[in-house]
Amino acid sequence: CPNCLDETRYFMSLKEKDDFKSVRFVMVGFENGTNDKDRLQRLKKYARKMGLNYGFYLGGEASTKQAGIVFHALNGVYSFPTTLFLNKKGEIVQVHSGFDGPGTGIHFTRLQQTTEALLRKLLEE
């Protein structure tokens, strides 16, 4: 999905900033395909194409229902991408659904500001 691509590029750019080098990013992909082998191949191709510099896992088929099963602690997953922010104890402190990419102008700028402020706060804990 285009928003997933934009989010991946954004998170990869964060990993290049000194402030966020210690942040651990992990992607759980929900992919189209007839079976998990096909889905995993699609996910690996995506990771190679993007030059992914953080870990990735297959969550299952591309559906919000499947994502809700995998992330059963949430009250549901309603869109892709959905980002979970965890503290150092591994507790979910914030969930963000969707992604306002560069094409959204000021909305992308605001997303960057709020995301980076949250990450700085979590790193200080």
Question: Where do the language-model regions lie?
Answer:
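Active-site-proximal beta-strand/loop segments in catalytic clefts of secreted hydrolases
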Residues: 28-31, 57-61, 87, 96-99
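Short low-complexity, flexible loop/linker segments enriched in glycine and/or proline
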Residues: 41-42, 71-72, 108, 113-114
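The canonical Cys-X-X-Cys-His
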Residues: 1-4, 83
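Structural micro-motif
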Residues: 51-55, 74-84
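Structural microenvironment flanking redox-active thiols in thiol-disulfide oxidoreductases
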Residues: 5-51, 62-71
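Nucleotide phosphate-binding site architecture
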Residues: 2, 34, 93
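Thiol-/selenol-based redox modules, centered on thioredoxin-like
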Residues: 79-125
